[in-house]
Amino acid sequence: MSMLAELVEVVIGVDTHSQTHTAAVVDTRTGGVLARATVTADPDGYAELVALAEQHSGLRAWAMEGTGGYGAGLTRHLAEAEELVVELDRPKRPARRAGAKSDPIDAERAARDALAR
């Protein structure tokens, strides 16, 4: 079985909430964060995230938890656009405490967790 990093050039980790979604675009080769964005959790925001992803060439995957909850609308939008979405388990509490809690950090963590699979 191939690891995600062998299949795509970037992973977009998304931290989903009821009003906003925060994303981090991570380069699979270098591990560097190429871009970050926070958008509204609505169709306009989803389109902004796809536009952000399209600024980075190559194959991509999206990683998020809550695809059936706060991330459901974004997940549907991405599925309609034929984007690859990886659903993550909620991080264990100690992992969440290992550093400051912030949406940008959680978005980056989502991308890195997907790459570790």
Language-model segments: what does each one mean?
Residues M1-R117:
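Phosphate- and other anionic-substrate recognition elements at nucleic-acid/protein interfaces
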